[in-house]
Regions:
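Short amphipathic helix-turn modules centered on a small-residue break
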Residues: 1-3
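A conserved glycine-rich
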Residues: 6-174
């Protein structure tokens, strides 16, 4: 039964590629037809441009799917943010990153659940762990791994100096 499930998963994956190819082929054929009609002055240049834009969009969508081919890319993920050195400034930056990733998840139809949150001393957060559930959440967010830096005039510094804040982000498949 388990082997059958694995085979069906592979078949569905291949079917997605075939459907994507057929969709792009249809759009390319429509573009060629639109261009032929344009040469005969039966359609406007704007209509050809519109057909071209649809082709490019579909091809780029396939290219992105090709970049997310690893098995774990299809999974949900755990995203952890830690504020770096810099006290309140970095804690505020970590909080901004948290809100940004939550909005990103929401806008892509992912479910976001905060499993651990430690507030900062004055503002922001020291650390947060979020579970982001949805198709390919890990694939889209894995490139966020690393240290994120923000340089700005600090609202917490009375002298109005520019401050550099750091926060680290770790993304792992769920």
């Amino acid at each position: 039964a388990k082997r059958a499930e694995e085979q069906m998963k592979k078949v569905k994956g291949i079917e997605k590629w075939i459907e994507g190819y057929k969709h792009v082929k249809t759009l390319v054929d429509e573009l060629a037809l639109a261009f032929d009609f344009y040469k005969e002055e039966m359609v406007t240049e704007e209509e050809v441009d519109e057909a071209y834009a649809k082709c490019i969009e579909a091809i780029e969508e396939l290219e992105l799917r090709n970049m997310l081919r690893q098995e774990e890319d299809q999974m949900s993920c755990v995203l952890k943010i830690n504020s770096g050195a810099g006290g309140t400034e970095s804690q505020d930056w970590a909080s901004m990153l948290m809100r940004m990733y939550m909005r990103y998840a929401e806008s892509h139809g992912y479910k976001c659940n905060i499993s651990h949150l430690q507030d900062g001393d004055e503002a922001g957060i020291k650390t947060v762990t979020m579970e982001i559930e949805g198709d390919s959440a890990y694939g889209y967010l894995k490139s966020e791994n690393g240290v994120h830096r923000l340089v700005r005039v600090s609202p917490y510094n009375a002298q109005g100096k520019r401050m550099t804040s750091f926060a680290s982000v770790f993304v792992t498949p769920l």
